[in-house]
Amino acid sequence: MAPIELFQRVAATVPAYAAFLREHGVDAASIRTEADFATLPFTTKDNYTRRHPLNDLCRDGVLRGMIAVSSGSTGEPSFWARTADDEKVIADRFAQVMDGFGRRPTLAVVCFSLGTWVGGLFTLACVRHLQDRGYPITVVAPGNNPAEIARVLPQLAPLAEQTVLFGYPPFVKDVIDTLDLPWASYHIKIVTAGEVFSEEWRTLVAERAGIADPVRSFASLYGTADAGVLGNETPLSIEIRRHLAARPDKAREIFGADRLPTLVQYDPAVRYFEESGGTLLFSGDNGIPLIRYHIADEGGLIPYREMLDRIGFEPAQQGPELPFVYVFGRSRFAVSFYGANVYAENISVGLEQPEVNRAVTGKFVLAAPEGADGLHVTVELAPGQDPSDDLAEEVAARIVTHLRRLNSEFTHYVPERKQLPLITLRPYADPGDFPPGVKHRYVR
């Protein structure tokens, strides 16, 4: 993407951005080089999109297309406009994923929330664009309704050669764990968005769904309501991530953190990424065009060749020669305990170990009350599982073992006598901590 050309077009045609530039004393004609572009002030929800009427944020000040609502996971919901042309650009990312799965008769099952929320209808629209391109795909959209999924899959999945589940990671796992369906016979593939997950999670879900090759049967999408899908996992990025997951020191050297980020590849022809202070900015020509938009995602950029030079092995997977972007779970999904930042991703790995993973769902709530004798972790039990002291002790042991392995701050900052977490086991779908049908909050 040519950022200067995009900037000049947005400055000339988007009323809100023209006003933003005037407010910051920027003369659009003075922005001629990428160095000039890098001096432009960041745009954010607070200083830009929430300060202007929705139509003024659109091209030519005209609101058109479909309106989506962000999940509100970091605050109040926001509204975003997207046209069919915008969807067609994003559909290229879906095409790359589906090409990786193989072009054969496919049932696509949209398990994201439907309605005004961005995930379900946007995914449905992109899959329909693939149908228009000749992909042999049939799509059904039961949304995040397990009963409806159980009703349609037995009838439709046997008619296809593979079934692709599109959904939020914890929901997809819940569906596979709780619905008594012959998953292996459906030749399942899984596409997720909305949450960082561990490689232990990928392996566990693959085993339960009868997936033989987790590298070529999964894809996580990195996206936002603001701009749609920004990047996607490829078999190459998954192989690299799985290699680094088993080598925390090497991962720390490359990513500079005690947690494993989502690792995807992106197309610089349609998304312009920048890194600033360990966070990501992007620019793109969407239904609401955005310039140097700061979405508070922690992460960074690594060019394709640099990544292959740094990982220390020769990947078996051939991948597109596209740059990598890595994205951590947001810092608000962490707690500070004795000065150590403990991330939700660190806790997840412990719950995905074979000693406990059939007794729990993988969902939890992490807290570090002032003066506590240990981290407080409230864990959701699997359906039909009763709580017990023995299980709580085993969960605590798995969590602390992998916290020490993955998080050097925790190991060195937290006194050993306070490293064992305090576990509370709650029933499946407990309305207080684990209400069904809503996006789960891991830190409260």
Give residue spans per PLM region:
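Nucleotide 5′-phosphate-binding alpha/beta core
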Residues: M1-L107, L159, D373-L422, R426-R444
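Short alpha-helical
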Residues: A16, W117-V118, A147-E148
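A glycine- and small-aliphatic-rich helix-loop capping segment at beta-alpha/alpha-beta transitions
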Residues: D86-K88, C126-R128, A209, I238
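Active-site glycine/GP-rich loop and adjacent strand/helix microenvironment
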Residues: E5-R9, R133-R444
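Phosphate/oxyanion-binding active-site loops and adjacent basic polyanion-contact surfaces
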Residues: D85-A91, V118-G120, N145, G167-Y168, ...
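Conserved AMP-binding loop of ANL adenylate-forming enzymes
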Residues: A95-L130
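Short acidic, glycine/Ser/Thr-rich loop/turn "cap" segments at secondary-structure junctions
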Residues: G75-R82, P105-S113, Y135-T138, Y186-H187
